[in-house]
A protein has these predicted regions:
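ER/secretory pathway lumenal C-terminal domains and tails of membrane proteins involved
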Residues: 1-352, 359-429, 444-591
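Residues that form or flank phosphate/diphosphate-binding pockets in enzymes
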Residues: 441
C-alpha cells in the first residue's frame, strides 16, 4: 500500500508539473518571446520621438534596466532563500541571452546587404519581424469558424515605422469581430480566405456543400472541427511525416489532399498492410514504383522506437517523461499552435524535426531492450554485441540502403542551373521579374554566391506590395543600377497607396491615351482632394484613366538591337489597364 501511494503521488505530481510546464511554455511564448521585444520597442519609440534621442537608445536602456532588476531579484532571492525565484530568474536570464542572437538580424540589416528581407534595421521593425506580423493572426483556443462573416472591426494598435524624423505612424492594426454563435472553442477550421482555397478545402474535407450563391450550405460542427484536427492536422500533416522517417515513404510526389492514395503517403513495405490502407500497390505505374523515394523500411525503426519507449518508462519513468515532453512539445504541440489551414503550398515536415529527434532517442534505447531479451537466450556475454549487430542491420543499414539515393543532393542542381540559364539569357543591365520564393532564391544564390550576372536586377513581384522592398529598388545592388520608382518613400509609406481604385475624371476623356509617367506622378502621386475618393470614409488616391502610353526612344531600341534597322518603330507603346483597382505591387510595376 505504501508503494502504491508513492506511485500515485509520483504520477499525480507528474501530471501537475506537466500542466505547470504547459502554462510556463505559454508564458514564455507570449511574455518572453513577444512582449519583451514589444516593450523594448515601445521604450525606443518614446526615447526617439519623445526625448529626441538616437535610435536604439530606448532599446538599450530597457535591457539595462531589465538586467538591473534581475540582479536585484537574484540578490533578494539569495537573502530570503527563495530558491524558486532564483531558479526562475536564472532561467529567464538564459532565455534572454539565447534570444539576444536576434540582434544579429538588426546588425546585418543595418549594413544594407543586397538581400535584406524585411529590412529589420531598428527595434520597431524587429517587433513585427519576431511577431510574424507578415503572416497574420489566427485563433488557437477560441475563435471564428470558416463560414463566419465579420460583423465589425476593432482597432488593436498603431503601426510605426522608422523615418527620417523618428518613428512615424503608418496606420492602425485591426482585427475582425464575429458574433458568438459563429465562434467555437479550439477552432481548427477557421480560415475563411479562399486565396489559396483554404475555406473550400475545409468544406470538401468535411463534406460541406455550396449553395447557388456561393455560400456554404451549413456551418461546421464541433465534431467537424475535431475531425479536421485528427484527420488533417495530426494525421496528414504530422503523422504522415513521422512515418516517412520511421516506417517508409511511398514517393516524393507532394501529397496535396487526404484520400490521394497515390502520392506522398507513408508505407511499410509489408504488402498486406499497405494494400489495406492504399489499395493494391503492385498496380502502381513503374514511374511511382521505381521512384527513388519509394522507401521500404518495413516499420522497423518505428517498432524499435516503441520498444525503446516502453523500456525507458519501465526503467526510468521520470527520464522517459522528460523525453516524452520533448517529443510532445516539438510535435503535437506545434501542430496545435500552428493551426494549419488545408491546402498547404508545400510539405511541412521540417517543422516537426524536434519530435523526430526525441523518438530517435527511444530507437537507441530499444537496443538495450533487445540486448536484455537476447541475454536470456544467447547469454549475457554475447548479447550486447549481438543486439548491436542485429539492430544496426535492421534499422540504420536498411535506411541507408533505401534512402541514400533520394537524400543525396549532390547531383540535384536543376534550381541552380535554371537560375544560371535565366540570368545568362538576359540582356545587359536587364530587370528580371520573378514570382515567389522558389523562382527568386536560386537567382539570388547564383548572383550572390557564384557571381553570375550581377548586372541584372532581380525583382520579386510578390514583395512589391511592401514599402521597404520598393525602397530597396532605389539603391544600386552589385552592378545593377538604381531604379527610379517615381514616388518618394513618404508617398508609399505603410499603407499609403496600398490600393488605388479607378475613378473616371471628366478632365480626362476616355477615348484618348495618356502618358503613364505623367498619370502616376502628377495624379496618382498627388494628394489633392479633387483627385481622391472619399466615399469609403477616408480619402483614397485614384487613377483617372485606363488608356495609357509609354514613349519609345527610337535611337535606343535601334542601338541595343531590340528592333532591326529595317523595322518601323512606333513613337509610343499603348495599352489598356484592365483592372478597376490597382494594388501597390501593380503600381510599383507600372512605375
Amino acid at each position: 500500500e505504501a508503494i502504491d501511494s508513492k506511485k500515485k503521488a509520483y504520477y499525480g505530481g507528474m501530471y501537475i508539473f506537466f500542466l505547470i510546464g504547459c502554462i510556463i511554455t505559454g508564458v514564455v511564448q507570449v511574455g518572453v518571446i513577444q512582449y519583451s521585444i514589444k516593450m523594448a520597442g515601445a521604450f525606443d519609440r518614446y526615447f526617439v520621438n519623445g526625448m529626441n534621442l538616437p535610435y536604439f537608445s530606448g532599446f538599450t536602456f530597457f535591457f539595462i534596466l531589465l538586467a538591473v532588476l534581475i540582479w536585484f531579484g537574484l540578490k533578494i532571492a539569495a537573502q530570503k532563500s527563495w530558491h524558486f525565484l532564483r531558479l526562475g530568474l536564472w532561467c529567464f536570464s538564459f532565455m534572454l541571452i539565447g534570444y539576444s542572437t536576434y540582434l544579429t538580424t538588426m546588425i546585418r540589416s543595418s549594413a544594407n546587404p543586397s538581400v535584406d528581407m524585411y529590412n529589420v534595421d531598428n527595434p520597431m521593425s524587429l517587433v513585427g519581424y519576431l511577431g510574424r506580423e507578415q503572416y497574420g493572426d489566427f485563433p488557437i483556443l477560441y475563435g471564428q469558424k470558416f463560414t463566419a462573416q465579420p460583423r465589425d472591426t476593432k482597432e488593436t494598435g498603431t503601426k510605426y515605422q522608422k523615418s527620417k524624423d523618428g518613428y512615424s505612424e503608418i496606420g492602425k492594426d485591426f482585427k475582425y469581430l464575429y458574433s458568438p454563435e459563429e465562434k467555437m472553442v479550439f477552432p481548427r477550421v477557421w480560415d475563411a480566405s479562399n486565396d489559396q482555397s483554404h475555406a473550400d478545402y475545409y468544406a470538401n474535407f468535411l463534406g460541406i456543400g455550396k449553395n447557388r450563391d456561393g455560400s456554404y450550405d451549413r456551418e461546421p460542427t464541433q465534431f467537424d472541427n475535431i475531425h479536421f484536427l485528427f484527420g488533417y492536422q495530426i494525421n496528414f500533416m504530422y503523422f504522415r511525416y513521422f512515418m516517412w522517417n520511421f516506417s517508409g515513404k511511398q514517393n516524393d510526389v507532394q501529397g496535396t489532399y487526404q484520400g490521394n492514395i497515390r502520392d506522398g503517403n507513408w508505407i511499410t513495405g509489408i504488402n498486406f498492410i499497405d494494400n489495406m490502407r492504399l489499395g493494391e500497390q503492385s498496380k502502381l505505374p513503374d514511374s511511382l514504383k521505381l521512384n527513388k523515394a519509394h522507401n521500404k523500411l518495413f516499420a522497423l525503426p518505428f517498432i524499435l522506437g516503441l520498444i525503446g519507449l516502453f523500456y525507458h518508462f519501465k526503467k526510468k519513468g521520470g527520464d522517459a517523461f522528460v523525453n516524452f515532453l520533448l517529443f510532445f512539445f516539438t510535435g503535437f504541440a506545434i501542430v496545435i499552435y500552428l493551426n494549419q489551414a488545408g491546402n498547404q503550398p508545400r510539405e511541412r515536415d521540417y517543422a516537426y524535426v524536434g519530435s523526430f529527434y526525441a523518438f530517435a532517442v527511444w530507437i537507441g534505447l530499444g537496443v538495450l531492450q533487445i540486448k536484455d531479451w537476447l541475454a536470456k537466450v544467447a547469454g549475457a556475454n554475447i548479447a550486447p554485441t549481438l543486439a548491436t549487430t542485429v539492430c544496426l542491420l535492421a534499422v540504420p543499414a536498411i535506411m541507408v540502403q533505401q534512402e541514400w539515393d533520394d537524400h543525396d543532393r549532390s547531383k540535384k542542381v536543376i534550381a541552380r542551373d535554371l537560375a544560371k540559364d535565366y540570368l545568362e539569357s538576359c540582356a545587359p543591365n536587364a530587370i528580371l521579374f520573378t514570382f515567389g520564393d522558389n523562382d527568386t532564391y536560386p537567382l539570388w544564390y547564383a548572383q550572390e554566391v557564384e557571381g553570375i550576372r550581377p548586372d541584372i536586377r532581380v525583382i520579386n513581384s510578390s514583395l512589391l506590395g511592401i514599402d521597404w522592398y520598393i525602397n530597396q529598388l532605389r539603391y544600386k545592388v552589385n552592378q545593377s543600377d538604381a531604379i527610379d520608382v517615381i514616388w518618394s518613400a513618404d508617398q508609399i509609406e505603410g499603407r499609403k497607396r496600398d490600393y488605388v481604385p479607378y475613378q473616371a475624371n471628366v478632365k480626362f476623356p476616355d477615348n484618348a491615351y495618356y502618358d503613364l509617367y505623367d498619370v502616376m506622378k502628377n495624379y496618382v502621386g498627388v494628394d489633392k482632394p479633387e483627385y481622391m475618393d472619399n466615399s469609403r470614409g477616408e480619402p483614397i488616391n485614384t487613377f483617372p484613366v485606363k488608356k495609357v502610353s509609354i514613349p519609345v526612344d527610337k535611337d535606343a531600341v535601334l542601338k541595343n538591337g531590340t528592333v532591326n534597322a529595317t523595322d518601323s518603330v512606333l513613337s509610343e507603346l499603348r495599352f489598356d489597364i484592365s483592372k478597376d483597382r490597382l494594388f501597390k505591387n501593380d503600381l510599383a510595376v507600372l512605375n
